[in-house]
Amino acid sequence: MVAWRWACLICLAFSLTTLVQRGSGDTGGFRLEDAVEGTSSVKQRWDHVTTTTRRPGATRAPAKPAGPPAEDDFNLADALDDQNDRDHDRKKPSIGGGGFSDKDLEDIVGGGDYKPDKGKGGGQYGGGDNSDDSGMSAETGTIAGVASALAMALIGAVSSYISYQQKKFCFSIQQGLNADYVKGENLEAVVCEEPQVKYSALQTQSTEPPPPEPPRI
């Protein structure tokens, strides 16, 4: 127990002396600056030892400044510019048939009714003839569908009637055969019963006692 107390006192004294030395700013203490300087010097020596001369990279020629874009080149900025939608006093080449321009799109978005240009109804995508042809084809398809449905219903009704008549005919034949069989059985029963009646009549007659004879004088 005494030894344990002495050990505790020695540890406490050692810790107190360490704290006093740190508080007084002893030069022998640990400083972060010394560690940083030591690592930097080591790094410099390592770089000095391991550095090797490298082959200089190939120099690239400076890129030529891009000239003005050609008229045929596509530029996304042209699509965002509203002035490009105008004609700029240039006549656009005529395109065969009807077309859909930005003006038509603005009319639709603005709530106005779309009115195609006159004389442009015979193009690739528009025209009264195409609408008439589509209407006629739709009507023809509807009529064909109705006619096929009616034909299938009629065929089903005829086949059902034929099968019903066949079943009815088979049942009638079966009933006729059953009736003939019953009649035959009845005739056999009658024929078998007649001899029995005669035999029973003869048997009753034989069992009766003979009449008494009259007395003789």
Curated annotation (Swiss-Prot):
Topology Cytoplasmic: residue spans: 163-217
Residues on Extracellular side: 26-141
Entry keyword Protease: no
UniProt biased composition (Low complexity): 50-64
Membrane topology, record value: Single-pass type I membrane protein
Transmembrane segments: 142-162
Protein keywords: Cell adhesion, Cell junction, Cell membrane, Glycoprotein, Membrane, Proteoglycan, Secreted, Signal, Transmembrane, Transmembrane helix
Listed Pfam families: CD99L2
Post-translational modification: O-glycosylated.
Entry superkingdom: Eukaryota
Protein name: CD99 antigen-like protein 2
Organism lineage: Eukaryota, Metazoa, Chordata, Craniata, Vertebrata
